[in-house]
Each structure stands twice: as structure tokens, then as C-alpha cells.
């Protein structure tokens, strides 16, 4: 497509392939190259998808990308994003924006000072099902939301993933709880207070190779949070219960009814709604043929640049999510309530009342 948004990757790890496949489905995006400190990884990805492998960051920047997608490992997000911003480049970062609240705040300030755009995953809340549920909540048809319940059941990753260590190093809240936390705050606004409990349910894990390891973080978490709006969130996150046993749902309960998103991950998930006291009825039909689209946030950022409007996957929102994740850890480890003070502009006001 003529005038397609030029995309480059920083990082060629496991998630880079799915990102490349998703971007290829959108002609308005053009993936032109990748740089990774592991040159072999970068070359393999480039050859597999038909774009360039850059020798270093200078060569990446010289390609004049419209957006750099930062797919480095989480511990490197802060430093690499900071360097990209320093080069005047627009960045879409994989989640989380940073591992520490102070680092996330520094990135937000750096982007604002340099006049560059900074966006961040997760962006799967921009999917069709997630937007349908959000639209129903924001329409006011279920009234004031008082309670949200969310389930993150990621199962025992070591039973299928060849290298599960990175998941267990950060734990289920940072790895996957970030999805419903990002989604519910996008819909309802900032969280102001958090309490959390955690435990090590399975202290010894057995990999597909037969090797054993001990998770670096507790594998089961129960989180309670209070939104600024007054609504409460009940969130469970674990690497213990499988999603086929207990679905990955998000349910909004309001004064006048409820909305159920059957899966916070899948764009083709079903959405059901009901007036108070009535049975749930289908609002958005499930579509198992809808693939995960990892490029939704990149697509949104590109569209916002073209339209001259704020992007919905804002750095301010991502910073708030980092603050919430930090509050969850502090609460569980210190046994106390933890306040969250950061705020962010509503992502739905960026393009109107709803997506």
C-alpha cells in the first residue's frame, strides 16, 4: 500500500513472529526491518518474513521508521525505550512499559519533553469483543458499575512451553493480570487503592524435558482494588488453574444490569448482557475464527498519527498500570493497603465516547 506506515522491530524474540504475522494482515502497515543483539535471531526473523536485518541501532534509525516496536525482554524495556526516545523515534513498547514506577514515569516525561509519541501494550483490549463489552458498559445501560470480577487462569505453562522460566520469574500478575487491569482501567478509569494476597501453590515445576525448577514469584494471586469511580475489582491471577477449567472472564456489575466478556484475550470472544435479575442474553456472538491480532496497538498508533489525534494506548495509561502492578506486589509482601496516585486520560475520549 502506498504511504503505508513504516514499522521496525527492536528485538526478535518469541513474540516477534506473531507480531510480524499480524502486521502483514494490515496493508496500511509495512514492516521494513529488525535489529536484535542476537544477529542470528534477527536474520532468521527477517528471512522468514521478507524484510531487512539491521546491524545496529544506528542502521535501524537510518531506515527512518514511523514507529519502532520495542519487543525486547521486559528488563530492557526502560533503557531501550529511553534510548529510542532520545533519538526522536516514535515507540510502541511491549508490556510492561517498565518494571519500576520511577522508570515508567521517566519515560512518560522524556516522551513529552521530546515531543515524540510513546505507546504501550497490552492492546488486545482494542479487539472487537472487548470493545463491544466496553461500549455496553459506557452506554450507561447497566447503570453505575459497582463491582468488576476478572479471572486470569493461565494454567501450568511448563506443561507446553519449552522455556517457561521467564513467565515464572515475573509471576502471573505482571505476565497476564496486566491484560484485565489495563482493560478495566481503560473502561472505568484509574485505580486508587490495592490489597493483595499471594501464595506458592506448586513450588516445584516439571518442564517438558523432565527438568524441575522453582518459580521466582508466587504463582497464585488474589487482588482487590478500588477504582476512583467507586467501583471495586476482584481479580484472581494464577499459573495453577487452566483456562478450559475456569474461563478468562471479565464481568461488570452495575445498578441496572451486568455485562460478561467471556475472554479478555480473544477478539472473537462472546459478550453477554442482562438487566438486573434477568438471564444473560447474547450481545456479541463468539467467533472462534478471529485470530489474535498482536498489532492492534501498532495499528491504533499509526491511525492516530495519520488522524492527528491522541492514541488510545497511551504512555500515561501504561505508567498507571505499572503503578498498579507495583502496588499489588507491595500489598502482598507487606500485608497492607497501598495507594495509587497516577492518572491518565480516558482512551475512549481519544476517538469519541466509544471505540
Residue ranges of predicted features:
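N-terminal Rossmann-like dinucleotide-binding module
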Residues: 1-49
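Predominantly a Rossmann-like dinucleotide-binding segment in NAD(P)-dependent oxidoreductases
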Residues: 124-214, 335
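Short acidic low-complexity segments
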Residues: 52-63
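Active-site loop of classical SDR/Rossmann-like NAD(P)-dependent oxidoreductases
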Residues: 37, 287-298
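Contiguous beta-strand/loop segments that form the cofactor/metal-binding neighborhood of enzyme cores
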Residues: 182-267, 295-309, 343-355
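C-terminal helix-rich "cap/oligomerization" subdomain common to oxidoreductases
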Residues: 1-4, 14, 24, 59, ...
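Hydrophobic residues in well-ordered beta-strands that form the structural core
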Residues: 55, 70, 93, 118-120, ...
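Beta-strand-loop-alpha-helix segment that lines the small-molecule cofactor/substrate pocket
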Residues: 62, 66-67, 73-74, 78-125, ...
